[in-house]
Structure formats: structure tokens, C-alpha cells
From Swiss-Prot:
GO terms for molecular function: potassium ion transmembrane transporter activity. The chain crosses the membrane at residues 52-72, 97-117, 186-206, 219-239, 249-269, 300-320, 323-343, 366-386, 422-442, 455-475, 479-499, 507-527. It is a multi-pass membrane protein. GO terms for cellular component: plasma membrane. PANTHER family: OSMOTIC STRESS POTASSIUM TRANSPORTER, POTASSIUM TRANSPORTER 11. The lineage of its organism: Eukaryota, Viridiplantae, Streptophyta, Embryophyta, Tracheophyta. It comes from the Eukaryota. This is Potassium transporter 11. InterPro entries: K+_transporter, K_trans_C, K_trans_N. Residues 1-51, 118-185, 240-248, 321-322, 387-421, 476-478, 528-792 are cytoplasmic. Pfam families: K_trans, K_trans_C. Coiled coil: none annotated. Glycans are attached at residue 444. Belongs to the HAK/KUP transporter (TC 2.A.72.3) family. It comes from Arabidopsis thaliana.
Amino acid sequence: MAARVEAATMGGEIDEEESDERGSMWDLDQKLDQSMDEEAGRLRNMYREKKFSALLLLQLSFQSLGVVYGDLGTSPLYVFYNTFPHGIKDPEDIIGALSLIIYSLTLIPLLKYVFVVCKANDNGQGGTFALYSLLCRHAKVKTIQNQHRTDEELTTYSRTTFHEHSFAAKTKRWLEKRTSRKTALLILVLVGTCMVIGDGILTPAISVLSAAGGLRVNLPHISNGVVVFVAVVILVSLFSVQHYGTDRVGWLFAPIVFLWFLSIASIGMYNIWKHDTSVLKAFSPVYIYRYFKRGGRDRWTSLGGIMLSITGIEALFADLSHFPVSAVQIAFTVIVFPCLLLAYSGQAAYIRRYPDHVADAFYRSIPGSVYWPMFIIATAAAIVASQATISATFSLVKQALAHGCFPRVKVVHTSRKFLGQIYVPDINWILMILCIAVTAGFKNQSQIGNAYGTAVVIVMLVTTLLMTLIMILVWRCHWVLVLIFTVLSLVVECTYFSAMLFKIDQGGWVPLVIAAAFLLIMWVWHYGTLKRYEFEMHCRVSMAWILGLGPSLGLVRVPGVGLVYTELASGVPHIFSHFITNLPAIHSVVVFVCVKNLPVYTVPEEERFLVKRIGPKNFHMFRCVARYGYRDLHKKDDDFEKRLFESLFLYVRLESMMEGGCSDSDDYSICGSQQQLKDTLGNGNENENLATFDTFDSIESITPVKRVSNTVTASSQMSGVDELEFINGCRDAGVVHIMGNTVVRARREARFYKKIAIDYVYAFLRKICREHSVIYNVPQESLLNVGQIFYV
């Protein structure tokens, strides 16, 4: 039978009209390469939101201080100096600035993030990619359409249906209608992610430098160069110990930050009582109006400094996965919010009496008897705040990698207890170099603060736009509520953004340059990955042609198992046809392995593998889809190959039982665990079924064949036990991992920018990134690379 190349299909589901256009050959392919609906349908959606006792909730609220609120809590170190970098001209400006700080903390962190945005988590996961994953599950907005309807049966895959004429359904259709809208949404997510990465550079720089700046207050003879040197030493030490993880010292974070909040609140109350109680009138919003009424560009640009009072909220949302939302809400409303209000009010009271001390307002407002203890606490709190932001950056990079938007880098799991604690070596050293460059280059808080504020306000704008879609598609709120939330958020954030535009030439350009560099890398990588996937879809080979070659595939079937890795969940990849065209032999058992990342935070181990048979039994061909969420890691101790074979053996056993009368289906797919198999068999005679199951209770109970024939068994009626022995014998003979070593190039007629992106940038990124064989822990002696060139 002549070879045939199928046209690409980017969707997992194919409607009836498309099916009619494909004709009988497509129908034949579907019969030979059956879907996994039956298998996936067996999986019960067991996700339930955890409920916590009051005591445990208070404990988690306390622990959340060290992970979630360190960055937001250290803002008093530098806010007033960045608000009035040129000094204070009118004492009433202090009241106006304090009023702006109070209502900024109320509107953005408290009302928007803690009580609205944090509820838009993906099974407890936060960050821009978590919001994007939610949208991908409720609308077909992924640019790489490798999802299938069976993926929706995962216990962690939650979604809702829409009424056909609802506002949500209309918005969904509008998003899905054009590829340009999907692309724009992805770029929006990437911009937000890149800004958070920039935040991971700027937060340690400004926090540690501000904390170290306290040395000059009590030791005035020390030069600024010494302060910068001390800050750089602390930063190098901080990044150098990242590979140890925070598991061992993480228990210290919450007490340190808790002590910090109590200290700044106590000092704030002391300063209010001692210096000026009239600052409490700043709780009236009328002073905001008077502040701007006095006019002047300086008052408008001072919003850039006010903006720093709410920095850390982006890390708050990104680090949300460690704690339940209710714990985060309690910690903010009971401890963080009142302590910050007291701290800022106390500084304002001190500055009202000593306006010349605005540059070092925090340290100068500390009573002399507790100065050095506060310096130590401030430095420790700055380190904890930096650690939280660095950890959030690692998490976002991992999420971007899982979505195909970041080059393959090494990800290390640093804790056996907590899934979310990871370390990305390459990103860590890049962050350290850039952080030191920013600290040593600017040498002062003002310009770093301008850069920091620019990054944060852009992340807030991105979050607002994504939240608008979440409220429509996921929460299905009334359009009036959506409009109120969006308009109020954009009015506040665009006001801050307009003020930050005046700071671009004063350091605000730094996050833009950093974000542009990371955005270029992430977009080119995603574009190259997308084009490669489209090429594979277009060049996949018909199953009808493969099976038309007969059980031997027109080759010599040699003992062993061939695991053919592909990104396709259906059809035969081009790599396999290329392999059998150029080599005269193929393994007795062939398994097409598709490792797929889904827009869910995790895939339970018992649902990891989907297995099915391809064609008649005597072909000994199978397909295995390994599914991962964006938080799942490929670890060395995963035993990927072992678990794959366990799923394959379990499939063959269950298929044999079904053929014995339990099912009319010729092909059957299973996923996972013996308990699921027992549940499946529970409908019949329990004792008889369990006796049958116990016969195959373990792989070791199967007697391996000592010699494997070099030809495939001709009979399609091979029993389940015989086939298990055959596959196990082939496994003992040797397992070979067949992977594509593809080179992606732009076509000659491609545009200039596409040639630059594919032939140079993407090629360079692929050259320096990790190979799939390393990620999947494939032994080099069992690896077979098949070279190909893809022209896109």
C-alpha cells in the first residue's frame, strides 16, 4: 500500500463535517488507532478542596508570613525616600502621600489581590501561567493544540460548561475564532511572566541594598561604596545557597517576618505617639484630593514612589501554592495590613518633625536603644523577601517550560516533603549576575526603585486583563460586575503606570530591557516548538499504510522493545516511517510514547499513563501517553520506564479478561493501578474476579521466556498470558529508546525575520538546552537518535 501523509489537525476533537471530508481512509485509521475515551472515562473526578481546623488554619496563616508577605513587608525600607527623592517642600505633602499609601494598600493588595485574585487560583496554584491554564481549560486558546477530550477526565481537570447564548459562550467563541487573539493572549501572559522574572532581579537588589544602607545612619563615616559591597556579598551568598533549597531553614522564615511586622508596628506606634498624632487624619481620602490640587509635576511623579508600597503582591500570588487562600487572607487582614499602616504612619509622623531625614526615614525613626537589633532584623527580613521572590521566579520558569514557552533547563526538586520547592541552576546564576549588575551599577535605592515600580505595575495590568477573562469564562460573573472590577482596577493601575512613564529614563528602562530579552527567548522558543509540532502533524503517516505492511512491517522483527518517542498522541510519527525506511529491522514490540504537558497543575500518578493497542495483536504495537501537569517534575528516581511497562502489562491483563466475556470491546485502554482494575472487576463475581486478578498480581509472577523468536507470532489469537510472557521476554532482551534528533530550518522562501528566528535564535537555544534523553533519564547505551530535517 502506498504511503500517505495526513493533513495536519491541530484540534483533539474532530467534528462530523471534517470527518466527512477525510473519507473512508480516515475512518479506517480511527478504527485501527482507537481513542482512549473508554479508559479515561473510568477515572473519577476526586478533587475536593481541603478543609482545615481553626487551629491548623491559624498555624498556616502564621507560616504564610515568611513565604508570601516578605516582599510586601519590607517596602517601608524605601517607600518615602523614593516618593520624595528631592526633599519635601510642603509638610502637608507627607499627609497626602500617607493617604495615598493607605488607600493603595486597601484597594490593590487587600481588595483586589487577597479577596479577588487569590480566589482565581488553579487548584491552589497562583501566577500568570496558572491563570492561563484556567483559561486553556475553559476555551481552546492554546496555540499548540495537543489536548484531547480524554484529558478532561483527569481528577485535576476541572471546567464548566456554557449556555450557548450566554455572554461567556460568546466571549469563548470570540477568543477561539482567530489565531491572532490566541497569540495575543499568550504574549500577554509571557509579558507578565517576564516582568516577574525581572522582579526576581530587582527585589533582592533594592531590599538588600536598603537594609544594608542602615549602616551609614549609625556609622556615618562609611562610604556608599562599602554599603554596596556589603549588599553584593549578601546577594552572592543568597544565590549561592539556593541549591540547598529552603526546606532546612524555611521554618525560620515565618518567625523572622512575624518579628519584623511586630517591630515595625511597635516603632510606628512609638513615633506616632512621640512626634505627631495628626498624621492619623491621612485616613481621610480628602487629603489625596488636596495633595494633587496643590499641583505640580513632582506630585504626579511621586506616585512612582507610592507604587513601591504595594510591591510584592505579584510574588504573593505566585507563591500562593504553598498555603490555602483562607490562610493567606487571615494573615494579611490580621497581621500584615494593620502593621504596615502603623509602620507608614509612624514614619510619616517622624518625617513631619524631621523632613530633612526623609532619605533615611526608616532607620532614623528607630529609637537608638534598639537600632542594631532592628538592623539585624531588617537585613534578615530583606533576605527572606528576596528568597520568596527568587522561589516565585523558579516556579514561573517551571510553568513556562511545561507550556512549551521556555527552553529546556535543568529543574531540581529540593524537598522530599513539598512538591513546589524547586531550584533552576541556570536561572539562578542569571538572576545573580543581573542582580549584582543592577546593585553595583545604580548604587542607590532611587533608580532601582523606579525600575522595580515599572515591573510591578505592568504585572498588575496583565493580571487585571487575565482576571477579566477569568471572571467571564471561569466564574461566569455578570458583565456588570466584570465591568466594575476591570474599570476600577485599570483606573488605579493606569494612573500609576502613567506616573512610571516619567521614570523610564531614571532607571525604569531596566525591567523593560530585561523583559524584552526574556520575551524574545520565550517567544522564539514557543514559535519554533509550535512550527515543529505543526510539521509533525502534517507529516504523520497513516496507520492504514503501516498495518498494510503486515505483522512484520515488511522488516525483520528482532528481539527487544522499541520505545518510539513522539509529540503526537495519535497517528504514526514521521520519525518511525523514516526509521523503517532506512533500516531493515524493527523490534518485536513497538510502543509509541507521547509525553504530554497539560494545562493542569499536576497529574496523579495513578492517572499518569494511558495505554492502548494499535492494530491486531500479532503486530505487538502499542501507544502510551504519559501526561504531566505544569508542577510535575521528571526526576531521576521516577522509574519512568518501569512504570510504563507496569501500565502496559496491566493493559494486556485487563484486555485478556475483557475478551473472556467482560466486554464486547476489541481494544481496551487502562490507566494505572491495581485498585482501579479491582474496581472494574467488582461488578461480576467478586471472588472469581479477584482470583483471576491475583493470578497476575505482579510482573515477577510472569515467567520470562528465555529465548525470543526473531519473528512476530503470526496468530492474532495469542492469549493474555502468552502475550505477557512474550512482551516480558522482549523486555529482557533489551529496551531501546528511539528519539528524533531533528534540525529545524526555515524554508528558502521564508521571510527574513523568520529565518533569523528559526535558523539562528531557535537553533542556538536548542543547542544549549537540555536534550529530551537527559530529561527522561534515558541511559545513553539504550538511546537511538534518528536524524531528520524539518523545514518550516
